[in-house]
């Protein structure tokens, strides 16, 4: 059975791409009456506030018609930012050699929170170098992953 997030992703790809952007990813966070649907959009030319507003209007219309979420929620549309969340194997592969932080569902090497360098991606497996050790992590074990920005 498809998750709500995967259904939402399939529903929102076309309207986001119709406006010339790509759907980087999304998160649906349930918090009682304060649930939030975060939609991240990207574009090789960057994302501006007007882009977020345009996409928000477009996908709000789709969400109003399709009504995939039965409870009240807040819609947030933004760029992934410098500490961008990572959702897919392709996104991790794009940042080979970069530092990421991951929160895991099940511990790996005794920890659910890891910070390391992306050493490789093969299929749905991420190789992360943490303190000189290579750890292989299934992408479906990653609850949340973020790029660590360099300054």
From Swiss-Prot:
It is found in: Cytoplasm. GO terms for biological process: ribosomal small subunit assembly; translation. Coiled coil: none annotated. GO terms for cellular component: cytosol. Its main location: cytoplasm. Keywords: Cytoplasm, Ribosome biogenesis. The keyword Cytoplasm applies. The keyword Cytoplasm applies. CDD domains: YlxS_C. NCBIfam families: PRK00092.1-1. Required for maturation of 30S ribosomal subunits. Belongs to the RimP family. This is Ribosome maturation factor RimP. It comes from Shewanella loihica (strain ATCC BAA-1088 / PV-4). The gene is rimP.
């Amino acid at each position: 059975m498809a998750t709500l997030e995967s259904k939402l992703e399939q529903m929102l790809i076309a309207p986001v791409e119709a406006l010339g952007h790509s759907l980087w990813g999304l998160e649906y966070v349930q918090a009682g009456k304060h649930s939030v649907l975060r939609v991240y959009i990207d574009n090789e030319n960057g994302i501006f506030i007007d882009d977020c507003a345009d996409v928000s209007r477009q996908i709000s219309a789709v969400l109003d018609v399709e009504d995939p979420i039965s409870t009240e929620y807040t819609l947030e549309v933004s760029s992934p930012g410098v500490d961008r969340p990572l959702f897919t194997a392709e996104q991790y592969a794009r940042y080979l050699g970069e530092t990421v932080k991951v929160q895991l569902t099940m511990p790996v090497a005794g920890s659910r929170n890891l910070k390391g360098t992306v050493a490789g991606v093969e299929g749905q497996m991420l190789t992360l170098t943490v303190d000189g050790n290579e750890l292989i992590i299934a992408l479906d074990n990653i609850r949340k992953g973020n790029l660590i920005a360099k300054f």
